[in-house]
Amino acid sequence: MLDNYKNKKVLIFGNTGFKGSWLTLWLTTLNANVFGYSHKMYPHYELLNLNNKVKTYFYDVRNLEKVKEVIKEVKPDIIFDLHAQPIVSLSYSDPVETYEINVIGTLNILEAIRTCHQPYISLFITTDKVYLDQGHLSYRESDELGGYDLYACSKVCIENIVNSYKKSFLDNILIATCRSGNCIGGGDWGVDRLIPDMMRAFSKKEKFKLRNPHYVRPWSYILDTLSGYLMLGENLFQKGNEYEGAWNFGPDVSSCISTHEIVNQSINYWSDLKSIQKNDYLGYDIQKPVFHETKILMIDSTKARVLLGWSPKFDIGDTIIETMYWYKQFYTNNKIITLDQIYEYNKR
């Protein structure tokens, strides 16, 4: 499995972020020649010491000339574009920067691919939030795109720009977009995100603020999500344009639970790991919502299951256990178990 990445030149935009750091490390275990493009270093990437193993170009993705320069120099076989301003709340406080990074940044990558005639394969990572909220139980790739909030709309723009560039200029380039659920796992310290906020609070023996406790999300384990990206890339290598287009990568319906439920399960497992009483400090205060969010969000990954043979290996219980265990090892033993979890995942 995933043998096609051996000795391939892989360029990851956003390689130092949460998903990017896991993907970078996984690809190094597959003996790929990995290169990165990011505007700064993030904690998990530093903890993994990846900067000493992977050449990363530290530039702003909004700089078209630098994007062109790097693609020309690397001459990648495949690009994974994970760069983003990914925080919904920040899209409200600074919408212009959100659109500059997400939309113009993607436009620059596409333009560089067009003018540099590289690479052969490109995967652009968007989000499950691109779908128009129609009250469906689960959205398929063919459903109408929407984007009520600013972040979601920026990702819809990306889907449309990628599709337009493909039709207008890049007929000979293999391109796909990936729409994944709420991805969780160890090593995420993003601001205003549920798991990082919870872990920071637990480590300080404080309560945290929880908004919209009854809203349902498709919670996906980090390695399940990334395995989908990697399998899609491999199929594009092997079978070409029949694997282009949009792809959902989400969990089983049983793993789509409310934020309240995932918090309670996390508290239960964290209590067991730390041998503490739940009422010692674990808990949260409800935060009044200040911006729009979809109440129920689920995506249908039938296409990936049937055509790629992909399916999540972890249910929501396993996902929470693996995530809490990563943070427990970090906060209690100062140990980084990312590589161990990748190896264990591959054995399942």
What are these regions (language model features)?
Residues M1-G181, Y325, D340-Q341, Y345-K347:
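N-terminal Rossmann-like NAD(P)+-binding domain of SDR-like oxidoreductases, especially those catalyzing
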Residues T29-A32, F202-R348:
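C-terminal substrate-binding subdomain of Rossmann-fold SDR/epimerase-dehydratase oxidoreductases
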Residues S93-D94, L150, G187-G190, E293-K295:
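Short, solvent-exposed loop/turn segments at secondary-structure boundaries
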Residues Y45-L48, Q134-L137, D188-D192, I222-L223, ...:
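Short aromatic-enriched loop/helix-cap "lid" or pocket-rim segments at secondary-structure transitions
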Residues V130-Y131, C183-G185, T225, S254:
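Conserved sequence/active-site signature of Rossmann-fold short-chain dehydrogenase/reductase
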Residues G146-S154, V191-I195, P218-I222:
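The catalytic Tyr-centered alpha-helix of NAD(P)H-dependent dehydrogenases
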Residues N15-G17, I79, I109, Y165, ...:
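Generic structural signal for small/hydrophobic residues in well-ordered secondary structure
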Residues T106, V191-I195, Y229, V263:
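Amphipathic alpha-helical segments in well-structured domains
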